[in-house]
Amino acid sequence: MSLQQTIEQAFENRNEYSPATMPQDVRDAINQVLEQLDNGTLRVAEKKDGEWVVNQWAKKAVLLSFRLNDNYVQAAGEHIQFYDKVPTKFADWTEAQFKEAGVRVVPPAVARKGSYIAPGAVLMPSYVNIGAYVDQGAMVDTWATVGSCAQIGKNVHLSGGVGIGGVLEPLQANPTIIEDNCFIGARSEIVEGVIVEEGAVISMGVYIGQSTRIYDRETGEIHRGRVPAGSVVVPGSLPSEDGTHSLYAAIIVKKVDAQTRAKTSVNELLRLA
């Protein structure tokens, strides 16, 4: 039986499993998947022929992993302890391992085992959950959170306090995806499997879930669940049909190409909106 088949079958029987009853072959399979997610050789979602494909079986392995162990005390230096069932990614790393990985981790940043942090990425005091993929050159700024199985592209900047939703709680079908070269402004939230396409700029305080209307003021088109590539997005509202009230919406105020994005600062793009 293949690794994928073992995970798929185990997921069907997941309610039968506990740390005490988990079969050894299932335990080994889950740990193998977690190790591959941890070193980046496997991803919960990947782009193939221009479309995002979700490896649902890998996500199922992440969900199963919470049945592997009971909570246990995890020490972090002399004065800090955690009580959890998932180990942290860097708990046993040496200086040589950090240098080889090429990542910068600023205390007290935490990444869970089973997340991947690519070379050149910087974790300010932040949190990266299990199954997440943070690609090369990404900046996860202070108090930003990268949810379980979320996919963060190359050179993405997640500003202070940004929340990128996960798939575990509440259970979601697909991970939230931030494609390459995106900027997510402070305190914004992108959740529920929304895809922010390449080069988009999200202003401070924008909240986008699957039901959020994303209104393009140039075309009048309304998107849901996807921010088109190169969009510059700010918070706003749209009027009701009877004109009695307005409801929140994300507003695409302009589109920029890669050349303009490279020559123009994020602040300028938003200020000129």
Swiss-Prot record:
List of residues binding substrate: R104, D141
Descriptive protein name: 2,3,4,5-tetrahydropyridine-2,6-dicarboxylate N-succinyltransferase
Pathway(s) of this molecule: Amino-acid biosynthesis; L-lysine biosynthesis via DAP pathway; LL-2,6-diaminopimelate from (S)-tetrahydrodipicolinate (succinylase route): step 1/3
Enzyme Commission number(s) of this protein: 2.3.1.117
Family matches, as PROSITE patterns: HEXAPEP_TRANSFERASES
One GO BP annotation of this record: diaminopimelate biosynthetic process
Pfam families reported for this sequence: Hexapep_2 (PF14602), THDPS_N_2 (PF14805)
Gene Ontology cellular component terms for the protein in this record: cytoplasm
Keyword tags: Acyltransferase, Amino-acid biosynthesis, Cytoplasm, Diaminopimelate biosynthesis, Lysine biosynthesis, Repeat, Transferase
